[in-house]
């Protein structure tokens, strides 16, 4: 059993952020493959968000110490907890350091010593190594992904000269650049561009989010809609838009990856994102990178993306082949050393006699069936070594005959 432990001080609520979507999608893919998996929450009881994920098994614990009693492979999500587990534990670090420390009672710096750490991007691995001041050279990266719903959703047809549609789907916190976005609307380069801006209320369950939400509701240029609770509904929302903006700040927060960017491109949208953190790693053909915390640069990026229009069918297809849930879970199983990964990576074919592995055998009087005649196992690994050995033996035989 692979148990994902939600270590956040907030419940596991759908639509609140990428960490929830990332984790739920991986659990679903594991279950689809027949690998037991579940979500564990601590201290919330059954009010932990499970109603948003009816297809995922949940286990509610009263305290972190109960984790020590489980015979599971523990994968902490957000940050590790200071618990001695029965088996090697892992932690997927979804946020940059040291943001966990602020008002989170479960956070302990010492908890990072035991579990094996996994990051969501190459950028994240770098900043965590520097923060922890330890050699984590083998810290693996397990990239997030876009649910298949995003690549499959149909984009509705719109009147040819209708205003472009721009979407901000990040959480309503300053980290995500919502204030930069508001400031960008004041620049002349956008005032003459016909477009409509939609913002979801994701993250409005926090104090900061509720304040921002009230402000947005009074803005004449912004339409506020409910955050979508599942991939299918989110995909439909994105498909109605041409551009998705991700103006994440670089001052007091750094985006480790950016799932929304991947999902948007799979849905056929252009993305305007800050050249910050792990966001550049999300560019699969449809991203315009702009200077972070710069409203004027953001306005120019939005204008450029609107002029380019949504991705073409060909561009969307190419983008959708990258960052899939299958690839993400393959990487996860590899990082966990799970036997399912080992089995799935075993060779499923053998090279036939006379293939390109054996072209040199004919030069030494050996037939194309030489490997079979020599009783060799035809696996990709053994074939090369045995064929090379046979060739060397044949050369020695020829050389010996020449001397005689």
Where are these regions (language model features)?
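Glycosyltransferase donor-sugar binding loop
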Residues: 43-45, 196-210, 227
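Short hydrophobic beta-strand element within catalytic cores of glycosyltransferases
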Residues: 266-273
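Nucleotide-activated donor-binding/catalytic signature segment of Leloir-type glycosyltransferases, i.e.
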Residues: 209-232
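A conserved mid-protein helix/loop that constitutes part of the nucleotide-sugar donor-binding site
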Residues: 21-25, 173-187
């Amino acid at each position: 059993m692979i148990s994902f432990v939600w270590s956040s001080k907030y419940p596991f609520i759908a639509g609140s952020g990428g960490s929830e979507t990332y984790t739920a999608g991986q659990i679903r893919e594991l279950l689809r493959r027949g690998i037991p998996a579940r979500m564990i929450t601590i201290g919330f009881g059954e009010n932990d968000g499970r109603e948003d994920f009816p297809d995922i098994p949940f286990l509610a614990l009263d305290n972190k110490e109960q984790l020590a009693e489980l015979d599971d492979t523990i994968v902490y999500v957000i940050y590790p907890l200071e618990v001695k587990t029965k088996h090697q534990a892992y932690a997927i670090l979804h946020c940059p350091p040291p943001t966990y420390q602020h008002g989170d009672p479960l956070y302990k710096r010492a908890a990072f010593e035991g579990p094996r750490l996994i990051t969501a991007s190459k950028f994240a691995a770098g900043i965590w190594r520097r923060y922890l001041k330890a050699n984590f050279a083998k810290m693996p990266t397990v990239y997030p992904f876009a649910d298949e719903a995003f690549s499959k959703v149909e984009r509705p047809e719109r009147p040819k000269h209708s205003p472009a549609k721009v979407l901000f789907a990040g959480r309503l916190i300053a980290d995500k650049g919502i204030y930069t976005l508001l400031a960008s609307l004041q620049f002349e380069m956008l005032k003459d561009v016909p477009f409509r801006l939609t913002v979801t209320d994701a993250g409005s369950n926090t104090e900061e989010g509720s304040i921002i939400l009230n402000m947005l509701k009074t803005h004449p240029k912004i339409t506020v809609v409910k955050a979508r609770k599942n991939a299918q509904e989110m995909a439909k929302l994105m498909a109605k838009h041409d551009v998705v903006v991700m103006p994440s700040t670089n001052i007091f927060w750094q985006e480790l990856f950016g799932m929304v960017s991947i999902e948007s491109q799979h849905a056929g949208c252009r993305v305007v994102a800050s050249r910050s953190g792990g966001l550049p790693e999300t560019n699969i053909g449809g991203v315009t990178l702009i200077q972070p915390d710069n409203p004027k640069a953001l306005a120019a990026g939005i204008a450029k993306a609107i002029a380019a229009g949504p991705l073409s069918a060909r561009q969307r297809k190419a983008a959708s082949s990258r960052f899939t849930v299958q690839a993400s879970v393959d990487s996860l199983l590899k990082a966990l050393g799970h036997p399912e990964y080992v089995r799935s990576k075993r060779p499923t074919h053998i090279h036939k006699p006379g293939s390109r592995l054996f072209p040199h055998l004919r030069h030494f009087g050996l037939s194309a069936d030489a490997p079979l005649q020599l009783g060799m196992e035809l696996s990709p690994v053994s074939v090369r070594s045995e064929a090379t050995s046979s060739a060397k033996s044949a050369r020695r035989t020829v050389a010996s005959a020449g001397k005689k």
